[in-house]
Swiss-Prot record:
<feature type="compositionally biased region" description="Basic and acidic residues">
    <location>
        <begin position="153"/>
        <end position="183"/>
    </location>
</feature>
<feature type="compositionally biased region" description="Basic and acidic residues">
    <location>
        <begin position="308"/>
        <end position="321"/>
    </location>
</feature>
<comment type="function">
    <text>May be involved in regulating transcriptional activation of cardiac genes during the aging process. May play a role in biosynthesis and/or processing of SLC2A4 in adipose cells.</text>
</comment>
<feature type="cross-link" description="Glycyl lysine isopeptide (Lys-Gly) (interchain with G-Cter in SUMO2)">
    <location>
        <position position="201"/>
    </location>
</feature>
<feature type="compositionally biased region" description="Basic and acidic residues">
    <location>
        <begin position="269"/>
        <end position="282"/>
    </location>
</feature>
<feature type="compositionally biased region" description="Low complexity">
    <location>
        <begin position="139"/>
        <end position="152"/>
    </location>
</feature>
<dbReference type="InterPro" id="IPR037393">
    <property type="entry name" value="Bud22/SRFB1"/>
</dbReference>
<dbReference type="InterPro" id="IPR015158">
    <property type="entry name" value="Bud22_dom"/>
</dbReference>
<feature type="region of interest" description="Disordered">
    <location>
        <begin position="137"/>
        <end position="342"/>
    </location>
</feature>
<feature type="coiled-coil region">
    <location>
        <begin position="52"/>
        <end position="77"/>
    </location>
</feature>
<feature type="region of interest" description="Disordered">
    <location>
        <begin position="357"/>
        <end position="389"/>
    </location>
</feature>
<feature type="modified residue" description="Phosphoserine">
    <location>
        <position position="214"/>
    </location>
</feature>
<keyword id="KW-0963">Cytoplasm</keyword>
<comment type="subunit">
    <text>Interacts with SRF. Forms complexes with SRF and SRF cofactors ARID2, MYOCD and NKX2-5. Interacts with the N-terminus of SLC2A4.</text>
</comment>
<feature type="modified residue" description="Phosphoserine">
    <location>
        <position position="293"/>
    </location>
</feature>
<dbReference type="Pfam" id="PF09073">
    <property type="entry name" value="BUD22"/>
</dbReference>
<dbReference type="GO" id="GO:0048471">
    <property type="term" value="C:perinuclear region of cytoplasm"/>
</dbReference>
Length: 441
């Protein structure tokens, strides 16, 4: 029996098949079919109970009605997913399950629901979709491999056909290509042979240049004559020496000239060494200064020590103290001068105030001049005049305190008045500190 096609909403794509989702979608259908089946079974139970006949027929009908009731209760307890999965896994036939002697009410209920025509259509469609999905997955690798091989074969065939068509249309081009290839091969061979000939000529030329020079040298002359010839060679000989390479005879004649050549080499090395190091640079710069001293080893050190000494002298010059200006306070003053200085006008008003000493916090007239304080250790000639000076300092401090009192006697806030009175009382009490106070005092 061929399965009817599903509507577009229920169609299953083989590429995106998820069986669990399909089972969940089937729950609604299973519940609707279960209601229809239960309604039908209830009607049949009522019919069986209403039948009349012999006692055996009545007992038989009662047993059938009891079975149907058990199936109805089993259907109510069944879950829709169990019905769908069992229908998808096996081909369930209701008649076969009923004929089994050990079949239970749940087995019969599942078989009855799965055998319903509406649910059976949906289950068949799902089975077909699952089978198509399996076939697609199995045939996909084989199809890809066959397509790839066929595509490669087609590309090769197309390329060959295009080449054949071009050759058939333009046969002259193929001939030109072949000729070009032959020309390139012959040119490469000619270039290789020409390079070999040039190398052979260059090898023969230096050999021909070296042999006449070696034959023309006299063998009987001593080492002194050879050294003279080497010391002052002719310009033509020098050019020949540059062009030709050294031969074994030249290398044999070299030990006779060691004396002159070693001196020249040592001079060249010394000049090179003088230019390359810092101490030799100092030596060249100080050659005019130290020309008398023949010892070259200590010249670099002398230059460094001179630099250090010059640096020390410059720093000492910078750190020289400035000439001291004699201060006015350093001169000795007598107490008589101090007394006379009192009446002099103060040159500059000083703005230093003390928090702890009232004598320093007073107005300008009551402040002490710093010159009033007689230096104790610098003026030891007048020891008998020290007590009057001290009394004078205490008097001036007391005057300053009184002037502060006068300035504070302006009308103030009550709290300020109270603090002022308290301070006055404290100043009076301070007189009696350390004494026994009697009633008369």
């Amino acid at each position: 029996m061929a399965a009817d096609p599903l509507p577009p909403s229920a169609m299953v794509q083989p590429g995106t098949l998820n069986l669990n989702n399909e089972v969940v979608k089937m729950r609604k259908e299973v519940k609707r079919i279960r209601v229809l089946v239960i309604r039908k079974l209830v009607r049949s139970v009522g019919r069986l109970k209403s039948k009349k006949g012999t006692e055996d027929a009545l007992l038989k009908n009662q047993r059938r009605a009891q079975r149907l009731l058990e199936e109805i209760h089993a259907m109510k307890e069944l879950k829709p997913d169990v019905v769908t999965k069992s229908a998808l896994s096996d081909d369930i036939n209701f008649e076969k399950t009923c004929k089994k002697p050990d079949s239970t009410a749940t087995d019969r209920a599942v078989a009855r629901l799965a055998g319903h025509p509406l649910l059976k259509k949906k289950i068949d469609v799902l089975k077909d979709a699952v089978q198509a999905f399996k076939d697609a997955r199995q045939s996909a690798p084989a199809a890809e491999s066959s397509e790839s091989t066929s595509g490669e074969g087609r590309c090769k065939d197309i390329a060959r056909s295009k080449d054949d068509a071009r050759e058939s249309q333009h046969p002259e081009r193929t001939v030109v290509r072949e000729q070009k290839a032959k020309d390139t091969n012959t040119a490469a061979k000619n270039a290789a042979s020409g390079s070999k000939e040039k190398l052979a000529k260059t090898e023969q030329a230096p050999r021909a240049g070296t042999t006449p020079g070696s034959q023309g040298r006299p063998s009987g002359k001593g080492a002194g004559v050879n050294s003279e010839h080497q010391g002052a060679p002719a310009p033509g000989d020098s050019n020949q020496g540059k062009a030709s390479t050294k031969t074994p005879e030249d290398s044999v004649c070299e030990p006779a000239n060691n004396g002159v050549s070693e001196e020249e080499e040592s001079e060249g090395e010394k000049e090179y060494f003088d230019d390359s190091t810092e101490e030799r640079f100092y030596k060249q710069s100080s050659a005019s200064e130290d020309s008398d001293s023949g010892d070259d080893f200590f010249i670099g050190k002398v230059r460094r020590t001179r630099k250090k000494e010059s640096g020390v002298h410059s720093s000492a010059k910078e750190l020289k103290p400035l000439p001291k200006v004699p201060s006015k306070t350093s001169t000795l003053e007598t107490p008589w001068d101090v007394r006379n200085d009192k009446h002099r006008p103060i040159p500059e008003a000083r703005k230093f105030e003390s928090v702890f000493f009232h004598s320093l916090a007073g107005p300008k007239s009551s402040r002490r001049d710093p010159r009033e304080q007689a230096p104790k250790n610098k003026a030891p000639d007048f020891p008998e005049n020290e007590p009057p000076v001290k009394k004078q300092f205490t008097k001036s401090a007391y005057r300053g305190f009184e002037s502060v009192k006068q300035t504070m006697q302006a009308p103030l806030h009550p709290s300020w008045e109270a603090s002022r009175r308290r301070k006055e009382q404290q100043s009076k009490i301070a007189v009696f500190q350390g004494k026994k106070i009697t009633f008369d005092d």
